[in-house]
């Protein structure tokens, strides 16, 4: 019997540069939040790279106005795992930045504990 698997990547994995490819392969994305100029964006979804870089070039006080990132929410991670489970997946392989570079991996690991009776999350 074949085990159905799903690959999940955080948007920090640069996979967003080939969206047609990750969609074709069935890879899901857990998106990082970008905070910039008083607005919040989901990386790779509602933040156009060209517009973003143009905005960076015109910052009046770059030292104090640089963009910041924030982790995805627990609900966003659960929604991703729920979709995988509903698709019949028994295993999920998550590709994310190191736990030493931010809190996203640790949050993913904590959320994955809630699914240990349903599927294996690596």
Question: Could you say what each language-model-derived stretch is?
Answer:
Residues 91-98, 122:
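Short glycine-rich or small-residue beta-strand-to-loop segments that form or flank ligand, phosphate
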Residues 96-116:
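Short Gly/Thr/Asp-enriched flexible loops that form oxyanion-binding sites at enzyme active sites
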Residues 4-76:
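N-terminal glycine-rich anion-binding loop in soluble enzyme alpha/beta folds
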Residues 4, 91, 118:
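Residues at the starts of beta-strands that form the adenosine-phosphate
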Residues 1, 78-90:
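Glycine-rich phosphate/diphosphate-binding loops that line cofactor/substrate pockets in enzymes
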Residues 75-79, 106:
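Short, contiguous clusters of charged residues that form electrostatic/catalytic patches at enzyme active sites
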Residues 116-122:
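Short, intrinsically disordered, charge-balanced linker/junction segments flanking boundaries
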């Amino acid at each position: 019997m074949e085990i159905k698997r799903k690959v999940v990547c955080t948007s920090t994995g640069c996979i967003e540069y080939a969206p047609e490819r990750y969609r074709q392969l069935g890879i899901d994305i857990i998106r990082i939040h970008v905070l910039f100029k008083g607005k919040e964006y989901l990386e790779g979804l509602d933040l156009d790279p060209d517009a973003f870089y143009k905005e960076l070039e015109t910052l009046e006080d770059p030292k104090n106005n640089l963009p910041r990132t924030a982790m995805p929410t627990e609900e966003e991670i659960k929604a991703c795992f729920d979709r995988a489970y509903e698709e019949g997946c028994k295993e999920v392989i998550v590709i994310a930045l190191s736990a030493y570079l931010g809190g996203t991996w640790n949050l993913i690991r904590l959320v994955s504990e809630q699914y240990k009776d349903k599927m294996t999350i690596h």
